[in-house]
Each structure stands twice: as C-alpha cells, then as structure tokens.
Amino acid sequence: MSGGLDILQLKEEDVVKFLAAGVHLGANNCDFQMEDYVYKRKSDGVNIINVKKTWEKLLLAARIIVTIENPADVCVISARPYGQRAILKYASHTGATPIAGRFTPGTFTNQIQAAFREPRLLIVCDPRIDHQPVTEASYVNIPVIAFCNTDSPLRHVDVAIPCNNKGIHSIGLMFWLLAREVLRMRGSISRALPWEIMPDLYFYRDPEEAEKEEQAALARQQEEANAGTTAGFSEWGGAAPWGADPMATAGIAPTIPAPFAATTPAVSADWDSVAPGATDDWGAEPAAPSSDWGTAVTMQEQAKPSTDWA
C-alpha cells in the first residue's frame, strides 16, 4: 500500500529491526489463508514471513486507523501478557482505548452491563487467543485488524498483518511501528526525523526482573551515599583494626590517674603480742561489772520476791 512513493517504502533500518526482533519467524504450521504471506519454509519446519508484505499491511492498517475521527473509538485488545504493555503504550501515544487482560464477554453486545462499549475499530494481538472480541465484533459489524502468525485463523478478520505474534520483542516492535506510522500520517511527528520513543518501551518486562533492577539501583545509591560520607575520613590513616586502642591509633598518649591510696589501719606482724590488760587464761573469772551504772545486784537478790507492794 505504499503506492510507489519513496517516502512510504520500507527502509533498511526498519528491516534490521524486523530481523533483530524476529518478526519474520513464523510457526511450524501454516493456515491455507496465510500461505500468500509465507516467503519460504526452513529445513527445521519454521515458516519465514515475507517482511515486505508485513510492511504493506502495516501501512494499510495505519491508513484505516487514521480515518477514525475520534482516536478513542479505536479499541486495542490483548489477553496475552506479552502484548499488554505494548497496547498500553500504543494507547497512550495514539489515544486509543486499551483492554488489557481478560475480555468480559458481552462488552460489545450486551448493553445492560457497565463495561458496554461501541468502538468503530478493533485491533487484536492474536485472533486465536482473542477469539471472543473478534466474534462479538462480527455481530455488530466492527472492522477487525489482527496481528496474525502463519497458523492463525482469519475468520472474521478484515485486515491481517503477518508477523510473529508470539515473540516478546516482535509484538512490541509491531505496535511501535504501527503507532509511529499512525502519528506520521496524522502529522503529529515528522518523517524526516526519527521518533524519539524507543521500541524498548513497548517490550514486555517481567515484574520480578523489574523489581530486581529497582533493588539493585537502590543498593547502588546506598553504596554511593555511604562512600560519600566516609570519604572525608581517609586522612586519618585508614580504618583501625578491631580491638586496637582508639587513643593509640590517633597518636594521643593515654593519661591514667594515680591509684587512690586507701587509709587502712596498720596491722602488726607479731601475732604473739597481747594487748595491754588482756589475758590468755580462759579459766579466769570474768571481770566485775562497772559500778558506774548503779549498785551491783547479785543473782540471789534478783530472784528474791519483793514484799513491798506499797
């Protein structure tokens, strides 16, 4: 559909992108309606898709999309996880309406449900996986543009774009090329300058890998922050070994105070010496009590009952 115009011809850089992403690699099986898009069959059974016909059908699809006045009337659907990121990016750049994930049956036919929609054009990633919206579109006369592999059924498909719709990079590149051509035909971007959006933005990313990349980035930032805080301490001679005296490593002589002299009574070394007035005779009578406390009273006087009750 280039019409013989040089500006619409397939460029070498686009061919390199096709081959790098594996757009030309089809399936082992081939539908009878897709035989016209097969260039040849390899010895291992893989069908090779003619990328020139892929480009022609891509231009035809872009011309159809441009004819829709309201971009939101174009509905893009992908139930396969590999194409959900691609359709979301395509919708953000072209203004289409994306349906990523499971398609609710009756969205195009049941007017009672809240998710009812009436699009004017439908774009699907795989007519085999997205068979439900393709079938409902045939009931309400909605044109269908589909990315088809060599084994994809073409029933109810109006425009089939032959490509590898099972590859992560392939389906992302096809939506990137379609979005670029739509914007160029609308006049939003110039054909003389390359599009500033890279195809990598349309590629599927595993959530676990994305989380690992974020954790690695945070770890690098933390290491850089730690290196920045410890950079000013290198002039002190490096890190000191564990167990070393911090005062000694800093070159400061420790000041230890003199021990406190306890005032303890002197003890005589002669244990045989006896204090004055002491006796070694254990059989001697005890000393008489002092008379300072009053008159001494004998035991007999204490035991004698008193008769003076007055």
Swiss-Prot record:
Q: Which GO terms describe its biological process?
A: cytoplasmic translation; ribosomal small subunit assembly
Q: Where in the cell is it found?
A: Cytoplasm
Q: Which InterPro entries match?
A: Ribosomal_uS2 (IPR001865), Ribosomal_uS2_C (IPR032281), Ribosomal_uS2_CS (IPR018130), Ribosomal_uS2_euk (IPR027498), Ribosomal_uS2_euk/arc (IPR005707), Ribosomal_uS2_flav_dom_sf (IPR023591)
Compositionally skewed regions (Low complexity) per UniProt? 216-227
The cross-references to PROSITE patterns, in alphabetical order and at most eight, read:
RIBOSOMAL_S2_1, RIBOSOMAL_S2_2
Which segments carry the region annotation Disordered?
A: 213-240, 271-310
Instruction: Select a single GO molecular function from the record's annotations and give it.
Output: structural constituent of ribosome
Q: Which GO CC terms are listed, alphabetically?
A: cytosolic small ribosomal subunit
Give the main localization category. Answer: cytoplasm
Write out the entry's keywords from A to Z. Answer: Cytoplasm, Ribonucleoprotein, Ribosomal protein
User: In terms of domain of life, where is this protein from?
Assistant: Eukaryota
The answer, when asked if Transferase is one of the entry's keywords, is no
Q: Which HAMAP family match?
A: Ribosomal_S2_euk
Subunit and interaction comment: Component of the small ribosomal subunit. Mature ribosomes consist of a small (40S) and a large (60S) subunit. The 40S subunit contains about 33 different proteins and 1 molecule of RNA (18S). The 60S subunit contains about 49 different proteins and 3 molecules of RNA (28S, 5.8S and 5S). Interacts with ribosomal protein S21.
Q: What is this protein called?
A: Small ribosomal subunit protein uS2
Q: What is the lineage of its organism?
A: Eukaryota, Metazoa, Cnidaria, Anthozoa, Hexacorallia
